[in-house]
Regions:
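Short amphipathic alpha-helix adjacent to the substrate-entry channel of hydrolases
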Residues: 48-66
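N-terminal cap/lid segment of alpha/beta-hydrolase-fold proteins
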Residues: 1-28
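Primarily recognizes the serine-hydrolase "nucleophile elbow" in alpha/beta-hydrolase
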Residues: 87-150
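The serine-hydrolase catalytic nucleophile loop
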Residues: 44-54, 79, 198
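Mobile cap/lid helix-loop segments that gate and shape the active-site cleft of serine hydrolases
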Residues: 140-176
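C-terminal catalytic histidine-bearing segment of alpha/beta-hydrolase fold enzymes
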Residues: 201, 210-256
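Short beta-strand/loop motif that positions the catalytic acidic residue
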Residues: 180, 186-188, 192
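Conserved alpha/beta-hydrolase "acid-adjacent" motif
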Residues: 193-202
Length: 256
């Protein structure tokens, strides 16, 4: 595996406009590509917190991975983070730079966790559907109205004000569903106390009503404390539970 750090998709953003490219040793024109997006309630963390997922996708699934930063809502409110991820997606699909040659960018996957799951959905559903192979939301904020009562403050920080009904429509992934939308996988632990599983359940209901392809991976983990229950405890960098990796890999291979 080879890592090319700090490829800028938007130079004016500085550090927040950077992504790291992970390339498998055996890159071919058939090597599939994934855009990955970290979580942190839209207001914290950076790309290194999702590097364990990027390493797994690259080293074990032989995929090319562009793992990105974006502007945090604590510094720049919505739509900044959404716009940044969308720009990163366009850049990964179409930028004519040497680092992005040699692998398949005709159709990419988009993947994220927690708030990054929301941003993955918002990105994948707003890019041209014929260019997106699939979207993976790992314990993501898929339905914002189901999630809002759990932590209203993160929405006030995201938007820069207390949200109104029209705000929910703008930041809701379901708003951007069409019959041509790409396949979507939502994974969620039943007792996630950071983002409730109802967020994934309600979103997948909307996907089903829309007539597009939605898949669920709901599971149980014996963990305590405030947690999504997605990471193997004490893993550095964070590594997903094996059953999660297996289910995500199945989705990626089926939709490649």
């Amino acid at each position: 595996m080879r890592i090319i750090n700090s490829i800028s998709y938007c130079p004016p953003l500085g550090f927040r406009g950077l992504g790291d490219l992970y390339l498998p040793d055996n890159v071919t024109p058939e090597t599939r590509a994934v855009l990955t997006i970290h979580g942190g309630g839209w207001s914290a963390q950076e790309k290194n917190t999702f590097s364990g997922v990027a390493i797994w996708l690259c080293s074990e699934l032989n995929m090319a991975v562009y793992n990105i930063n974006y502007r945090l809502s604590s510094i720049a409110p919505w739509p900044a983070c959404g716009d940044d991820c969308l720009e990163a997606g366009r850049f990964f699909l179409d930028a004519d730079i040497p680092e992005f040659q040699g692998f398949d960018r005709k159709r990419i996957f988009v993947m994220g966790g927690s708030a990054g799951g929301h941003l993955a959905l918002m990105t994948g559903l707003r890019l041209p559907p014929e260019r997106i192979a699939g979207i993976v939301s790992i314990s993501g904020i898929a339905d914002v109205e189901a999630d809002f009562p759990v932590d209203p403050m993160r929405y006030k920080i995201l938007l820069g004000h207390t949200p109104a009904k029209e705000d929910f429509a703008e930041i809701s992934p379901a708003t951007y569903l069409t019959p041509a939308s790409p396949a979507i996988l939502c994974t969620h632990e039943h007792h996630d106390n950071v983002v409730p599983i109802a967020s994934a359940e309600r979103f997948l209901e909307a996907v089903q009503k829309n007539g597009s392809a939605g898949e669920a991976c709901f599971y149980d983990k014996d963990e305590n404390g405030y947690s999504h229950r997605i990471w193997i405890p004490d893993s550095v960098p964070h590594k997903l539970y094996q059953e999660l990796e297996n289910r995500i890999a199945k989705f990626l291979f089926e939709h490649a």
